[in-house]
């Protein structure tokens, strides 16, 4: 088997990846995610996940309607906990060991609090670590949370799954003339204001020389596995 150049990756999933038009958490979508996880593990690559909560709640949207932004962000972070528990449950049913870690303390044995040492130990043991609650603080996106967790666990790269197959000059869903980048520098992505990730996430990854790959897993669940095998898919952002 061709060995991947990556030993440990962090996969950033949106909450929408777990939903369909009828269900905020769709069993079929969950199983697709678990199959992707298993394909990564089969290549002897360790994987951690940061999951969003937009399928359940978006604090920023309700803030525009008058809700206190801090309250909305706290509610959004709680939504990510529900998504993380759902992924972990289906993983366990498929004999994939997991460890769920939250950015803020949750009692009652629901999940562990973030501890980068314990997270790395779990990854070394072959477990999938699922991070939730973003950074644990309001006013930060889950993209920034993904960058932070990737740095904490010494990941080789952040893989962000999106609706499109990379980073484009403009939104390809709205503009059919948009062109896809094969690769970008962090400075270029920030200067061009390409809003596939927020500036804080790009800046953190740039500072720590942490590669980002933006790709789509909507049409082909093998895309991440293919990238790990060296196929030139998606858009790579690096120094």
From Swiss-Prot:
SUPFAM superfamilies found in the cross-reference section: Carbamate kinase-like (SSF53633)
One Gene Ontology CC term in the entry: cytosol
GO BP terms, alphabetized: 'de novo' CTP biosynthetic process; UDP biosynthetic process
Residues that coordinate or bind UMP: 53, 73, 135-142
Residue ranges crossing the lipid bilayer per the database entry: none
Domain of life the protein comes from: Bacteria
GO MF term list: ATP binding; UMP kinase activity
Pathway: Pyrimidine metabolism; CTP biosynthesis via de novo pathway; UDP from UMP (UMPK route): step 1/1
A Pfam family matched in the record: AA_kinase
Keyword Nucleotide-binding set for record: yes
Signal peptide boundaries: none
HAMAP family: PyrH_B (MF_01220_B)
Physiological role: Catalyzes the reversible phosphorylation of UMP to UDP.
UniProt record similarity statement: Belongs to the UMP kinase family.
Descriptive protein name: Uridylate kinase
Native species: Ruthia magnifica subsp. Calyptogena magnifica
């Amino acid at each position: 088997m061709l060995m991947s150049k990556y030993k440990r990756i962090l996969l950033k999933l949106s909450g929408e990846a777990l939903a369909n038009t009828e269900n905020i958490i769709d069993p079929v979508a969950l199983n697709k995610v678990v199959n992707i996880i298993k394909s990564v593990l089969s290549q002897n690559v360790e994987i951690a996940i940061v999951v969003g909560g937009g399928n359940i709640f978006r604090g920023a949207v309700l803030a525009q309607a008058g809700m206190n932004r801090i309250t909305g962000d706290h509610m959004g972070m709680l939504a990510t906990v529900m998504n993380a528990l759902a992924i972990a449950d289906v993983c366990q049913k498929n004999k994939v060991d997991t460890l769920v870690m939250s950015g803020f303390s949750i009692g009652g044995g629901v999940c562990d609090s973030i501890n980068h040492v314990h997270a790395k130990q779990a990854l070394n043991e072959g477990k999938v670590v699922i991070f939730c609650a973003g950074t644990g603080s309001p006013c930060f996106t889950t993209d920034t949370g993904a960058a932070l967790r990737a740095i904490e666990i010494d990941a080789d790269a952040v893989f962000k799954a999106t609706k499109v197959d990379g980073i484009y000059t403009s939104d390809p869903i709205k503009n059919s003339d948009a062109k896809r980048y094969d690769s970008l520098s962090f400075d270029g992505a920030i200067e061009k204001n390409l809003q596939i990730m927020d500036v804080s996430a790009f800046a953190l990854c740039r500072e720590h020389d942490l590669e980002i790959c933006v790709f789509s897993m909507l049409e082909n669940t093998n895309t991440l596995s293919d990238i790990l095998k060296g196929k030139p898919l998606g858009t790579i952002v690096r120094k």
